[in-house]
Amino acid sequence: MTRDQVLQIMKENNILPEAGFGQNFLCDEEIIDGIIDAAGIKPGDTVLEIGPGIGALTQQLSSLDINLICVEIDKRLVSYLRKAYPNTEIIDSDFLKLKDYGAEKIDVVISNLPYYIMTDIMMKVFEEAVNARKIVYMVEEAALDRILCESSTKSYGPLAVVSELYGNIRVVTKVPGTCFVPQPRTTSAVISIDCHDNRPDKDLIVFIKKCFAQRRKTLSNNLKGCDKEKLNKWVKDNFIVENIRAEALEPTDFRDLFNTLK
């Protein structure tokens, strides 16, 4: 979908981007092709597109031999998408509030993530799309630091830990603001996640969040109610410092500790 096509659709359907939803419509066919290639979609796959917007990706995805599910919060866009792609399932909902969408059947997830709800959407997908093979996101370039950062850094938190445990992450390409309508001031990046078979389940993800509940507190203080004897022994066996915080742990340490405290 080109810039002219996006502008024409906006004009014909009286659609203006809604700042409250963080809407910037992708309009670069090379980037669109790159995202779909990175998704590694196979015939018969069930593909979830979160926030299809004006349909830049939907246009190509709907032509493939797949089961495509799109979730869109903006009712104006839902109306347009249902007319433009009548054979595609368009769910009118806030994805973060959505419950029954067949999450366990999803093979591939694709989304252009608004920065302000990026973490919430990623965590929900991690918890619910338990059989997904591949995940491809467009994020603000500045947000990469929260996904790919190392332990003991300021940005290190549950998102980085779960992302690392969930799969192999690769930065596919950088996307300048000129590839969107309207043009944002920031650069974006496309990332792909090849999901591991032994990815963290919801219980482990909840545990990781709990470890970081209050960053300045020690693990012992954040993990109230756990077996303190087991926790203290695990810390003593693995670290020099006893009053350790979650930010000092490597991603694999969280799984080890979780299994220890079961």
Question: Where do the protein language model's features map onto the residues?
Answer:
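Catalytic cores of RNA-modifying enzymes
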Residues: 1-206, 210, 252, 256
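Generic C-terminal helix-cap and adjacent flexible tail
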Residues: 260-262
